[in-house]
Amino acid sequence: MAKKAVASRGARCYAWPPMRKRFFLPAAPRGARAPLRFAADAPWLAPLAGYSDLPFRLLCRHYGAAVCVTEMVSAKGLVHKSPGTGELLLSLPEDQPLVVQLFGAEPEVLGAAVLALRGAGYAWFDCNMGCSVPKVMRQGAGAALLGDTARALACARAMIGAAGGQGRVGFKLRLGLDRDRSILPDLALRLEDAGASWLALHPRTARQGFGGSADWEAIARLAARLSIPLLASGDLLTARDGVRCLAETGASGVMYARGALHDPAVFATHLALLRGKSPPAPDAAALRAMISLHVRLARQYGGDGGALLKMRSLAPRYVRFLPGVRVLRQRLCRCTDWQELEAALDEFLDGAVLS
């Protein structure tokens, strides 16, 4: 896809084209085949529907995310060339390695989607078998696959075969549909036998959604049974949670989701803790730098309209612990352009007092 080069402080960057109403599949950028890392010091950014777009991934990589996963991409949308699907795949060389997460319930469609992505240069794929959103489950996709092991395995084999064998495809799982219908360790072991390269486990059931507590003991039990990497997810709201989860479960690595939404610098804090360093307390200057970077990335790569709406939602999360954030949120909701939004954030941070 053509990109118009523009100057920015002596560096080469790109002005992203406006969003298109027709379907297009962007070619994977240089570095798309960079190897994945599974290690305590290689924290991943989880797939976050509506949030883990290119600007947010670049922000998280700035703070140390080793691998990022796209938002959920509909396999059917790719195969049938639905408008808007391709935008979820926009990337850059510095956004690598990147895992494309697909969702769907038809093995032949998932396989065809992987083939199309491989043809465009993408190298790493993930199948969502954990999304508990009713809209997704009604399609038989996401966590609904946990209730149909035969279909789940057929989908897995189709993706692995289309990807060219072992080493390219992972699967994100939950414990099962509910406590009475656990799929562990049976499905996980069968996915490993089918050629899965890695698994990620959010140790809640589909019925739980995000309620209750994540069962980290289930991660530990599964990690002890697998010979492929296992990424831990669930209740990793801070870097200390992530480091503690690694110690308690023996997982190969961690995947931050809500923790990254609240604080994209969670990756830097995670790495500091592993090195035995005390991370610095948050201050207004650090918050301003993080928010300013996200705004700049969103303006450059986020397309029209939607990027501003998304930033109006995200910015208050970053300063949620400061007094006056409710008023800020209300003010941001009335912002209709980037200048208004930046002025509101600057005014808020100028008066911020961090204890």
Predicted regions and their residues:
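Extreme N-terminal basic, low-complexity initiation segments
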Residues: 1-9
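Alpha/beta catalytic cores of nucleotide-metabolism and tRNA/nucleoside-modifying enzymes
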Residues: 3, 16-44, 49, 54-55, ...
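Short, positively charged and aromatic/hydrophobic N-terminal segments
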Residues: 7, 14-15
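Glycine-rich, positively charged N-terminal anion/phosphate-binding segment
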Residues: 20-39, 48-123
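Hydrophobic faces of well-ordered beta-strands that scaffold small-molecule active sites
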Residues: 43-47, 68-70, 98-102, 125, ...
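Alpha/beta enzyme core
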Residues: 112-125, 129-139, 150-228
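Short glycine-enriched, charge-decorated loop/helix-capping segments at active-site entrances
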Residues: 140-146
